[in-house]
Amino acid sequence: MIQSINHICFSVANLEKAIEFYQNILQAKLLVKGRKLAYFDLNGLWIALNVEESIPRNEIQYSYTHIAFTVTNNEFDSLKEILIQNQVNILPGRERDDRDKRSIYFTDPDGHKFEFHTGTLQDRLQYYKEDKKYMTFY
C-alpha cells in the first residue's frame, strides 16, 4: 500500500541555476550536491534534481501539470514579491472565484510549473458543492 510521496525528482539543464532557484525561491535546504545531482529538504519533502542537458523542454508549457505548495494568506503577497524581485517566470493564472482562494503560478529555470495556493481541499470542495451543481460528490 502506498504510504506517501517518497520524493519528487526534476530533470534540470543547469544544476547551479536550479540550486539557486530551489534555495532562494522555494527556501529548500540543500542536503547534498554532486556533479549531476542535488538533494533538498523542503519541510520534510525530499526534492531531487538530476542533470539532463539535452532533452526538449519547450513542450512543458502546454501542460497544466504542476506542484502546488500551501501558503498562508498572510504570506502570499511577500512570496509573490520574492518571485518578482528574483525575476521568476510568473504565469498568467486562470479566472478564479474568491471562494477558490489565492494562487500564483510560476516556473523554475527548466520550465517545471509550481503554484503557491492559500486554499485547502476542503475549501475547494465546499465551493464546488455550492456552485457546481453538475458535479458528482462521493
From Swiss-Prot:
InterPro entries: Fosfomycin_Res_Enzymes, Glyas_Bleomycin-R_OHBP_Dase, Glyas_Fos-R_dOase_dom, Metallothiol_Trafse_FosB, VOC. Its cofactor is Mg(2+). The keyword Cytoplasm applies. Its EC number is 2.5.1.-. GO terms for cellular component: cytoplasm. One of its GO terms (molecular function) is magnesium ion binding. Belongs to the fosfomycin resistance protein family. FosB subfamily. This is Metallothiol transferase FosB. The lineage of its organism: Bacteria, Bacillati, Bacillota, Bacilli, Bacillales.
